[in-house]
């Protein structure tokens, strides 16, 4: 079935889905189009801060055991596994 903008479920073709325009609390997401607002790079993720990717080298996951710290790439909102 085609994606439904406004159902709070991120579906194919949508950048974001924060619900209806009346209920959306996400300034990074255009609730009417389910696309990021102008100037926004992201709306969630360990490497997203105020609609922008965190700088490359920002720690996003602290080392545990034999694993090293994980760092943001500056190009994605996801925190990659760097070990």
Swiss-Prot record:
UniProt organism field: Bitis arietans (African puff adder)
Protein name: Disintegrin bitistatin
Post-translational modification: Exists in 3 forms in the venom. The forms A, B, and C are present at 53%, 32% and 15%. The forms A and B differ by their disulfide bond pattern in the N-terminal part. No information is known about form C.
Main location class: secreted
Disulfide bonds: 5-24, 5-34, 16-29, 16-34, 18-24, 18-29, 28-51, 42-48, 47-72, 60-79
Source domain of life: Eukaryota
Further information: The disintegrin belongs to the long disintegrin subfamily.
Disintegrin domain ranges (all copies): 2-83
GO molecular function, one term: toxin activity
Subcellular location: Secreted
Motif Cell attachment site positions after renumbering to this chain: 64-66
Gene Ontology CC terms, in alphabetical order: extracellular region; plasma membrane
Function: Inhibits fibrinogen interaction with platelets. Acts by binding to alpha-IIb/beta-3 (ITGA2B/ITGB3) on the platelet surface and inhibits aggregation induced by ADP, thrombin, platelet-activating factor and collagen.
Keyword terms: Cell adhesion impairing toxin, Disulfide bond, Hemostasis impairing toxin, Platelet aggregation inhibiting toxin, Secreted, Toxin
Lineage: Eukaryota, Metazoa, Chordata, Craniata, Vertebrata
Alphabetical list of InterPro entries matching this protein: Disintegrin_CS, Disintegrin_dom, Disintegrin_dom_sf
Keyword Heme carried by entry: no
Tissues expressing the protein: Expressed by the venom gland.
Entry's family note: Belongs to the venom metalloproteinase (M12B) family. P-II subfamily. P-IIa sub-subfamily.
Quaternary structure and partners: Monomer.
């Amino acid at each position: 079935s085609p994606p439904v903008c406004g159902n709070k479920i991120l579906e194919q073709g949508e950048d974001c889905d924060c619900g209806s325009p009346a209920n959306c609390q996400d300034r990074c997401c255009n609730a009417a189009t389910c696309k990021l607002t102008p100037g926004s790079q992201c709306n969630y993720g360990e490497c997203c801060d105020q609609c922008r990717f965190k700088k490359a080298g920002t720690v996003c996951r602290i080392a545990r055991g034999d694993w090293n710290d994980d760092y943001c790439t500056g190009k994605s909102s996801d925190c990659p596994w760097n070990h």
